[in-house]
Amino acid sequence: MKKNVVLINQSTGYLMIDIVNAYAVQYDQVALIAGSIKDSERSLADKVHIDKIVVYDRSSAIRRILTWLFGTMQILFKLIFKYRQYEVVYVTNPPMSYLLAYFIHRPYSIIVYDIYPDALKNIGITEHHPIYRLWVKWNKSLFAKAKKVITLSEGMGKVLELYVNRSQIKVIYNWSASDKLHPIEKTANPFVKQHELEDKFIILYSGNIGYTHNVECLVDIAEYLRNDPSILFLIIGEGKKKEMIQDMVSKAQLTSFLFLTWQNKDVLPYSLSAADVAVITLNDDTAQASVPSKTYNLLAVGAPLMCISPQNSELARLVNKFQNGSCFEKDETENMAVYISKLKAHPEIRKELSANSLLAAKSFTYQNAEEYV
């Protein structure tokens, strides 16, 4: 008997592509229902049938909800009329997609990237709201019947225990987007040469500079280190807070910052490898959820990490496990400055942290996708 599976994810990126490809190895017919598919270094297998739905629109809260709802209705009709003989793998985008399992009676698994109804608290829907209470009941019923409930971190797994027995929860960590990432010495790094950074000790932040990213504390750290002209804070990316941080740097008369916009993906191996220390930030609201995807790219280039996150975060657990950096609370700016100075003064310590990052990277490769099947 043929094994058929349809996977559902409104916004598909490299992680989902790798997961779908893992299913394609073991299943006869594989379909992907998606609104958008972001280009990845690894392409979808030729045997995968792509079935398009409405693209997820992040531009406003109303558009998010409308595209979620419309996408869910499209998924329902496709499952009823096109995929009657298919096992189903739901991803929580749209968040309500797996609720269709109430009406679509066939084997299913659920991949939990965002936990609902818990995420509804961000818009004021709390445990006392009827929608919240009803969703809790749905979760307990549907999770119990699922073949697999898969999530991204131990912290998220702990939250899911409110809805399903821990034995049914499988934690699978994410992985790097690229196979091309590896350490590149500064002397052989064209990105370093282009920006004349050969003699700099580089503190790198690469990523979004939004309201939830505590990048501005790097300005306070730089104040402590202003007397060392060899230390450079390299900020790569864009976001709502970038201009504010540039203003802070200007007002403090700091010359130790270089701001660059997003770099071409071909530059990524070189820009990440430029880091003597790589910075990752998490706010309190997201600390328990998962490890930022950029972490795995930084591990692959052997970057020592300086994490600005709560000590009970998933990121802190990773760093403590692999001993490849240190985590600090956001107000520990002086301690972070001391940490940077220590790594600059003791290259042997930085070298050990770098080796530990490379060792950790071996646990976070796209082969992890095989665990989903």
Residue ranges and their predicted role:
Residues 1-46, 225, 368:
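N-terminal subdomain of nucleotide-sugar transferases
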Residues 80-83, 98-99, 103, 116, ...:
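Membrane-proximal helix-turn-helix segments that form the acceptor-binding/catalytic region
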Residues 196-213, 219-222, 234, 354:
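Conserved donor-binding/catalytic core segment of Leloir-type glycosyltransferases
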Residues 213, 262-271, 278-299, 304-317:
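Nucleotide-sugar-dependent
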Residues 200, 335-338, 342, 349-363:
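A short, well-ordered alpha-helix in the C-terminal region of glycosyltransferases
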Residues 14-17, 70-75, 80, 87-119:
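An aromatic- and histidine-rich active-site surface loop
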